[in-house]
Amino acid sequence: MKLIIATRKSQLALWQSEHVAQILKNTHQIEVLLEGFKTKGDVLLDSPLAKIGGKGLFTKELEESMLRKEAHLAVHSLKDVPSFFPQGLVLAAVSKREQSNDAMLSQNYKDFLSLPKGAKIGTTSLRRKMQLLLLRPDLEIISLRGNVNSRIEKLKNNDFDAIILAMAGIKRLNLDKQVNFVYEFSKDELIPAASQGALGIESINDEKILELLKCLNDENALIETSIEREFIATLEGGCQVPIGINAELLGDEICVRAVLGLPDGSEILKDKRMIKKNDFKGFGESLAKEFIAKGAKELLKKAESMI
């Protein structure tokens, strides 16, 4: 049997797809091919992600290729995957999670506190912008799009004093070797995006395919990301609004951190909870409902109007 993986063509997307392909080859001794596609999010590089808006910016074209029967599965950064799937497609697996925190890359400054007043920080994310301004209101946060290499290049050209990337991508592509300093944010400083660091394997809803993909599943990643995705789905929040949610398994307990608010950090809702591992089902939804009772929906509408 031959499996075809639909993938974006970015360096990180190809790494992720090749990583999954290798596991499938080793486990089942089957042929696995990669088919590259450009998504809307890859093409529209002039506008900040929040202004392009809409869900599925980095997934829609891959999903369409599966529905046309050109591919059997697609490998996504799970944080880019909307909560609901087109008919005929399913979330087949969530693979073992890489580090889920954010990091600051810089040529001249070894950590966040050493940044000078008014330092220029590059990031695409309103979630990061909001939390960075909570920590350092003096910073100038500038939208930064493009692939990882172009972002590193802009940093080296001194367009920015620092840029913010996910630790998962930094580790997968060995980006720490390309810059002088990498400062890892704690999850209390910067709460990550839902599912950050996890890979989501989406596939056609076919029993034979789903059976082959079972080997990719990681129970801990599934538990953590189900809380996070439930929280986002209940709030009906996409990647264009500033929401951070992270569930971290610590033995038989789970530490859940959540934040949402306005992009400038002037108004936020934030919480941190410890729950028993066995109580994870439904917790993301119940936490989101608590946030909604405190005015989360109104705050997110206000955030959208500021974009």
From Swiss-Prot:
The gene is hemC. Monomer. One of its GO terms (biological process) is protoporphyrinogen IX biosynthetic process. The modification S-(dipyrrolylmethanemethyl)cysteine is found at C239. Its cofactor is dipyrromethane. This is Porphobilinogen deaminase. The lineage of its organism: Bacteria, Pseudomonadati, Campylobacterota, Epsilonproteobacteria, Campylobacterales. It is an enzyme of class 2 (transferase). Tetrapolymerization of the monopyrrole PBG into the hydroxymethylbilane pre-uroporphyrinogen in several discrete steps.
